[in-house]
UniProtKB/Swiss-Prot annotation:
This is Large ribosomal subunit protein bL35. Keywords: Ribonucleoprotein, Ribosomal protein. Signal peptide: none annotated. Pfam families: Ribosomal_L35p (PF01632). GO terms for molecular function: structural constituent of ribosome. The keyword Repeat does not apply. It comes from Picosynechococcus sp. (strain ATCC 27264 / PCC 7002 / PR-6) (Agmenellum quadruplicatum). One of its GO terms (cellular component) is cytosolic large ribosomal subunit. Belongs to the bacterial ribosomal protein bL35 family. GO terms for biological process: translation.
Length: 67
């Protein structure tokens, strides 16, 4: 059976947590149009990583067969 291909776009966007049980992602809305957003919003609410929702996790794992 041939090797499964990893979806490169997904590999760049998602990382496994240390235990390998959850998938982490960057938060949205912090790329451009940032002038009207408060520093507090950008620092607290938009910074850091978030976990992929349980309903989406199966699809992400299919895109990352070796993760």
């Amino acid at each position: 059976m041939p090797k499964l291909k990893t979806r490169r776009a997904a590999a760049k966007r998602f990382k496994l947590t240390g235990s390998g049980k959850k998938i982490a992602r960057r938060k949205a809305f912090k790329n451009h149009l940032l002038n009207h957003k408060s520093a507090e919003q950008k620092r607290r609410r938009l910074s850091g990583m978030a976990l992929v929702d349980k309903s989406d996790e199966k699809n992400v794992r299919l895109m990352l067969p070796y993760a």
